[in-house]
Amino acid sequence: MKTSDFDYNLPQEYIAQKPAEPRDSSRLLVLNRQSEELTNRIFGEITDYFKPGDVLVMNDSRVLPARIKGIKQDTSAKIEILLLKRDGEGCWEALLKPSKRTKPGTIIDIHQPNGGISTQAKVLADKDDSIKLLRFSDETHLMKLGEVPLPPYIHTPVADPERYQTVYALTNGSVAAPTAGLHFTPELLKRLTEMGVICTYVTLHIGLDTFRPVKEEDPKDHKIHREYGILSKETASAICCAKETGKRVFCVGTSATRLVEQASHLSQTSLITSYSGWADLFILPGYKFRVADCFITNFHLPRSTPLMLTSAFAGWPFLRKAYEKAISEHYRFYSFGDAMLIL
């Protein structure tokens, strides 16, 4: 297995710049692993594939307004801050753009455009991979000073920032959306609940590494990024109950899948128990899934860890066939793109 095995060519015009409207009008490519059939559907028709008692696991992490514009106090130069994760009281790991000549001790002034609330950030230290450690003088209004960051391949402004949030987003912490969940509407979730589907939630805060290609020739040499997650006792109980009664667990997105598999991998007493901590499980082809029976996901970047996880679930030859079909039939790719359901 080589990283180059997970490469494919995608014309730029296939990268969706705007979300489908309404959310559940996006296309859905259904992959049946048993029959190796590929079926074109609309996402709102996904209810056809559920049965009463099935469990739907979704990631309720909310994207932070993590992109903040500031002015360097010493030079008056403009600078952009991208918050990555909190590191203690008032402290955050962040990427700065531009980052050159921004040494420890640099003060950055941050103001609302209308002259309202403000704060200062002090660069405390350099960390790995161009990451800086910042301390903010006042953290209370920090979330009001920024805007939601969009992926680097989306070049069109989004009229409504909430379209880059799931309708069930609850807990601030991600810098990228759990995009497989963007297709669900409140009405669709209501229909699933009325069918007897058990809708449950986990929280996994997604970092920027989700967009980064694996550079090592052998993916096993890649150091997977860590993301903080929480899986409640109630969600673990729902999953165990489904497994014990012959029902299926549908995981929405690579983030939810990764967390439930991590929790199951670490569980000492049963299939899965409640969990809170870092998720660093790297799922590659050959991995035996313990929790996920069915998988809802978007179309992923070449050489990315989400693509490798999806390949582990579907099998790369079958998944490649699905990607070739999606490209030939003009499916929309990446964060605002269409989805697939793998059965």
From Swiss-Prot:
GO terms for molecular function: S-adenosylmethionine:tRNA ribosyltransferase-isomerase activity. InterPro entries: QueA, QueA_dom1, QueA_dom2, QueA_sf. Pathway: tRNA modification; tRNA-queuosine biosynthesis. One of its GO terms (cellular component) is cytoplasm. The keyword Membrane does not apply. One of its GO terms (biological process) is queuosine biosynthetic process. It catalyses: 7-aminomethyl-7-carbaguanosine(34) in tRNA + S-adenosyl-L-methionine = epoxyqueuosine(34) in tRNA + adenine + L-methionine + 2 H(+). It is found in: Cytoplasm. Transfers and isomerizes the ribose moiety from AdoMet to the 7-aminomethyl group of 7-deazaguanine (preQ1-tRNA) to give epoxyqueuosine (oQ-tRNA). Belongs to the QueA family. This is S-adenosylmethionine:tRNA ribosyltransferase-isomerase. It comes from Dehalococcoides mccartyi (strain ATCC BAA-2100 / JCM 16839 / KCTC 5957 / BAV1). The lineage of its organism: Bacteria, Bacillati, Chloroflexota, Dehalococcoidia, Dehalococcoidales. The gene is queA.
